[in-house]
Amino acid sequence: MENNSNQLAANQIIEHDRLTFGDQFAPKGWYWHAFGSKFAGPRILRLPVLVRMPIFILRNLRFYRLPRRIPFTFDADGMATMAIPSFLKTSKFVSAYFRMRVASRAVVDPGLQWRVHQAIWCASNSMKIEGDFVECGTGKGLMMSAVLDSLPDWNNSSKRMLLFDTFSPFGIDSTTGKNSEEHGTRGTYATNIEDVAQNFSEWQKVELIKGFLPETLTQGNIEKIAFLHVDLNHAPAEVSVVRALWSRIQSGGIMLLDDYAQVQQQNDAMNELAQELSFEILTTASGQGIVIKP
């Protein structure tokens, strides 16, 4: 870390994790499992009638169910799975995720491992495509901090990272799409642009552009896009941004929609836009949408 504030945040996170018991990447969840499940299906019909009847009654009344553990390998950010998340143990991911937490300035793990993994995957594949990286809705810079940390050759590449945001701590008004003090502050939103710039100071060719979208898109001199990350928390603004930038995303380029399957309004709006622009959206279990430009 190049600055003291980043080092302080890193030390606080390390100490917090040291005091936390258990494996944060493999929480366990509860589910309901019937004692009588071994009699499920036609096998139960092999039992005598006087044995079957109490089982049927208890099953209908659900008296025979007790909680059992299910070995989730990941349970956070709106999803739970028993799949093998081998990426969690790779040095590339561990370093990138830690860097994201440093950018957040919060010692408590936000549980965004799967979301960060998806962003890293998108960015890694987009490095092979001609064009810049663009993020609309940067906040404190959590996701792109992880992305850049995962790309050791970034400073040697010809790509730029263009980060658009109002860099305001206040929530978004659903009617106007503007930041409003009435909606209070948001923990992942930036307090000011200076702090965000300091966070990205270790990387070259990172440009922060302040203002409301889509109006500020003209300031970036964007010609070709390899990777577009959209996280504006406001459906009309996201639609306007994607419509304005879609033609500049190169074939094979990737668009990542952060709130696609988490907010109904944004889901509906993007589905309509997908039909209009003829692209397909892959819905991920953690609620994001991934589009690969044909």
What is the meaning of each model-derived region?
Residues A10-N11, G41, R46-P48, W246, ...:
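Low-complexity, intrinsically disordered short peptide segments enriched in small/polar/basic residues
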